[in-house]
Amino acid sequence: MEAENEAHCCPGSSSGGSREYKVVMLGAGGVGKSAVTMQFISHQFPDYHDPTIEDAYKTQVRIDNEPAYLDILDTAGQAEFTAMREQYMRGGEGFIICYSVTDRQSFQEAAKFKELIFQVRHTYEIPLVLVGNKIDLEQFRQVSTEEGMTLARDYNCAFFETSAALRFGIDDAFQGLVREIRRKESMLSLVERKLKRKDSLWKKIKASLKKKRENMI
C-alpha cells in the first residue's frame, strides 16, 4: 500500500521499463486541478496558475510496491467538446474529475465531464476517481462529503476529498486511480484468457467432429 515519488517532473520516456499511465485531470476552472497536480509531482503549492492553460507533467512513483510512470495532462476548465479535447479523452487511460467543495456549480459541472468521456469512449467503464478539493476552506463549504460520496456511487468510482494547500489526500487520489486502472486491466486480461480457453475448446470440439465424420466415410 505504498506510494513514493522516485523523481519529480521527469521529462522524456519512462525509465526502467515502468508501466506508463496516461492520466487526465478534468474539472471546472478554479477548482485546483493544477495545484493538486503540482503537489503530487513536486510537493509545491503554486502561488498562481492561469486556469486557461493546459499543461503536461510526468513523474515516476511506486504504488503497492510496483513502479508507475504517470503522464498527467492538466486541462483547462471548460466543459466543452473540441478536437483537442477529443484527442486526450480518447488517449487517456484514467481520469480525475475535480470539483471544489466551496463551489456548488463546479460540483454540478462534474457530471458534464463524465458525459464528455462517454461521448468519446462510448462506455462508462473507464477508470475514474472523483475529487472534492479545497477542504481546508471548511468555512466556505457548499458541497457536503455525503454529496460527493453519493455522486461517486452513481459514477461507480472512488471518492477522495483533498486539500492542495495542505497537501492532504493528494497521493491517495492518484494512487486510487492507478489501482483502478490496474484492476480493470486485470479484469480485462481475465476475460480475454477465458475467451481464449473457450475458443480453444470450441476448436477442439470441431476438430473432433471433423475426425469422426472422416472415420465414418
Swiss-Prot record:
InterPro entries hit by this protein: P-loop_NTPase, Small_GTP-bd, Small_GTPase, Small_GTPase_Ras-type
One GO term describing the cellular component: dendritic tree
Annotated CDD domains: Rit_Rin_Ric
Ligand binding (GTP): 27-34, 74-78, 133-136
Enzyme nomenclature, EC number: 3.6.5.2
Subunit details: Interacts with AFDN, the C-terminal domain of RALGDS and RLF, but not with RIN1 and PIK3CA. RLF binds exclusively to the active GTP-bound form. Binds calmodulin. Interacts with PLXNB3.
Protein name as annotated: GTP-binding protein Rit2
Organism: Rattus norvegicus (Rat)
